[in-house]
Amino acid sequence: MSEGGGLRRARHPPVWLAFFVATSLLATLSLSVSAQVAGDTIPTDSAPRDTLLVPIPPEAVGGDTIPEALRAEAASMAGMAEIPLMPGVGAPGWGSARWEWGPEELARLPGLTVLEFLELLPGMTTFRPGGFGRPIGLTAMGMGGGRVRVILDGFEMDPLGANAFEIETLALLDLESIRVERSLSEIRIEIRTFRMPEPEPFSTVELGTGVFQTRVLRAILARGFGDHSVATGAFDLGSTGGIGIREQYRHSSAVFRWSAAPAPGSGLQLEWRRTAIDRAGTVYPRETARTDLVVRGRQELGDRITTEALVGRAFEEDREAERRLEVTQGALRGIYSAPSFSAEAAIRGRSLGEGGAPLAGSEAEARLAWLPTSSFGLELASRRMAGSDLSAVDSRAMAMMTPIAGFTVFGSGEFGSRLVPRVEHQPALPSGSSGASGELVVADATGWRAGAELAAGASAVGVAAFATGASPSIPFGLPFDGDGVPVVVERSTGLETYLVAGVPRTDGAVRLEGWYTYFPGEAVRPYTPVDLGRAALVFQGVFFEGQLEPILRVEGVRRGRARVFSAAGQPSATAPVSHRLNLSLQIRILDVEAFLFWDNLLADPAAIDLPGAPAGSSRIVYGASWRFRD
């Protein structure tokens, strides 16, 4: 009965869909009526202004009746402060291949996880998707596996038991901003956690449900204590019965963070984070629990320098393989930030516990961005990694020039090598389990990228050519390619473009946006599709002075044919061509938001190509979130 019920819900959209469509129509009608009323002429007041002013003697004014206790509490809350921010180095944009989402942008993105947000960015793609809750690999620009770094408030979320951290398990409501830098040798994801927007207590609750018994529950609560301390707690729970209600999955993420700013420009923070994954069924079952403990301190030195010191420990227990992985990490970094120049220097050290993943024992990194004029910019970066009697250095340089307003040309180059983790611990077949083993691999990190961008108002178009020498190609270290052997590949070239254009006569409310990446020739490099792209039509309106905001997005996604590592460890399998049509609708009224995410509307079976998993089907999730203050 449960299986049949799940399939019936997949074929017939829920009643909520009709509710959302009706709400959108009502919003449109309300807009028309509002515009008509706004156009009417309201007569001005014809009464003469009162010119009589009666002064009130000071002695006639009564004293303030606000109790002293309330006055002290208000003054305390007005002076409440979080720990200092660590500013980013380098401006986001097409030329720098760097993108950043703040709190408002994150609230408007369609998707249930951070991983789904990242797929929206140019060149980003996933491989071996098996549906919500199954293992999945993220890559870009022909890099292969092992090239994703996740840095959470300065603490790098080291992968334990795989080549990349499972970013889809992060608690969404606990994220303040996401900054993504896509070079030709790695994907660097810098995440800033939640900060109180106002002194008053703040909380948000989000509930969602959908087909295949999908459930989403999220919550966050933050409030101040005393003069200069803030406590934040967040919880994120996602579960599903899987396609056909046969592959149950559940993950939970809990976060507690205490921040203290005893003096202006200084702060101390303690953070505890625990993530549990329970993947049942027959397609790569897994039951793990990961805990991260971090202590960080920050200090501003003047108006432009901010320093940070942190130490943290991460350990993971895998009940399927009966192993424990752990790593201890310490880091020091400093950032200088000025309008025309910014620089960052950082060192990081690790102590690997027994059974830990292969990671660099020490790292040193320096980055700078120089903008002497509004028409010229230069960025330089270098990083040294050492571990397991190996070392590698990779460097990058980028220049941008704007000869005329709105037109920018850019070029970047990378050279050197880097250490890439290779883990082969997980079962080659779904029915088995094994212990962890792995090694560090010295991989080439050379390549170049050059192109141009033309921007006018809210519209922009950009093109770029690139070449990557990232070799060897490393598997993701996930169950479907855990026995994969690194493969030496030749240099690959490609072309990419993006477009954002407002639709005429819509006052910017309707826009087209998309991107496309093309690799000429046959799909030879593993995890590198012949082509991939996204195209979307987006409506975003703001009505009644910001009290009503509907967002409707319809997009098509294509991923071309690509070679992938098979369970036998060789890049001999082929991922099929996939076409998906997605729809998302979000309606915010004041502090309440309703959402509907309908992925793979046409049920393309190739949307899921994980070995052993059922064919792709539509996924419908809908729900609402409430934001509370005080």
Regions found by a protein language model. Give the residues of each.
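Outer-membrane beta-barrel "beta-signal"
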Residues: 592, 615-630
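Flexible loop and strand-edge segments within Gram-negative outer membrane beta-barrel domains
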Residues: 240, 245, 265-331, 357, ...
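Short loop/turn motifs that connect adjacent beta-strands in outer-membrane beta-barrel proteins
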Residues: 196-201, 225-229, 263-267, 300-306, ...
